[in-house]
């Protein structure tokens, strides 16, 4: 891939083909519910229906530079070039934020129907004068 346009209804890409042939505005068909904007250098499988080289269609775009390795049979992952991923492992779901925040938005609530464990602090009202659970325990313990 040499270029990408994610604004159109059907994403299009600029591609350099095997013999160095360049193609612009090649439609990239994506599976329903999934979309991505691949980095330059990603690889594509392009079909030319009826052998018509004037209208290619990229049916698969992959980038082996960033592909997660070592998945067990049956495991599935969603990933990017920054180390962020969601992996459906045989033991459970693993979300790797790649060192960035994980933000949930536009929901009426978050409900967890299981025990919650944290190795870090839990803070309430984090955008105002919230306190961590540890700070609240210190305040509470001082009253007893």
Label every model-predicted segment.
Residues 1-90:
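Exposed beta-strand/loop interface patches that mediate assembly or binding
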Residues 42-46, 138-144:
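Extracellular disulfide-bonded cysteine-rich modules/repeats
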Residues 41, 78, 87-88, 93-132, ...:
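Low-complexity, small-hydrophobic/phenylalanine-enriched stretches
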């Amino acid at each position: 891939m040499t270029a990408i346009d994610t604004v159109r209804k059907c994403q299009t890409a600029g591609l350099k083909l095997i013999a160095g042939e360049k193609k612009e505005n090649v439609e990239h068909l994506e599976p329903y519910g999934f979309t991505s904007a691949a980095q330059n250098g990603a690889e594509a499988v392009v079909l030319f229906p009826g052998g018509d080289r004037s209208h290619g269609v990229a049916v698969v775009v992959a980038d082996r530079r960033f592909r997660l390795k070592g998945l067990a049979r049956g495991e599935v992952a969603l990933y990017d070039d920054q180390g962020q991923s969601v992996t459906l492992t045989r033991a459970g779901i693993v979300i790797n934020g790649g060192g960035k925040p994980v933000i949930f938005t536009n929901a009426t609530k978050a409900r967890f129907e299981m025990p919650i464990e944290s190795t870090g602090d839990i803070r309430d009202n984090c955008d105002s004068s919230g306190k961590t659970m540890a700070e609240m325990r210190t305040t509470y313990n001082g009253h007893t």
